[in-house]
Amino acid sequence: CLHLKGMFLVMSFIASRKFTLQDQQLFAEFSGDFNPIHLSDEYARKTPPGKVIVHGINSLLWALDVFQSTGDNILDHLFVKFLQPIYLDETVYCNYYPDAQVIEISNTDVVFLRLKLSGNACIYANSISYSKSTTELEVSDLDFSDIESLERIEFIQSADPSYVKDLYPALFAGYGCPLISQISCLS
């Protein structure tokens, strides 16, 4: 149960999985994020986490994908907190708290990501335009319209849609490649 301001909320289990090195490599190819902390055991051993960690945006997109597969289509504003790193081959669970409109990724002891949903979907493939920009933005200040102007969006936008569909099938069916591309460029 999620404890929120003196209330306990009922959880609805959605899915579980283990992120593998192959998952990381596929996401890196799609997003352009080849940071070795996500791909190399040798490199990761020399970092504070000490082992390879899952791309945070990959875990976010997975949570959105499994949520989308439930049929609840509430995506307008996303408030995301990455609380702890997820390590490769660690079993994690995606849980949904419908009363609070919260999705969490956790294991039995630790919450790794908390996602607050609100609103109705309003992003359509035909309404989004992409352009290059050198404007620097803090991730905390971004909304979907800001993301369109980030430089890496052109790289991600060029991804084969069938490739994106394989990575996040329910999210792709519900929103298409543009939303997934916009979120991926934050990685």
Predicted feature locations:
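Short, Lys/Arg-enriched N-terminal segments with co-localized hydrophobic residues
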Residues: 1-10
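HotDog/MaoC-like acyl-thioester-processing domains
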Residues: 9-19, 72-147
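Catalytic strand-loop segment that frames the active site of acyl-thioester-processing enzymes
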Residues: 9-52, 123-186
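Hydrophobic beta-strand-centered segment that forms part of the acyl-chain substrate-binding groove
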Residues: 45-100, 114, 174-187
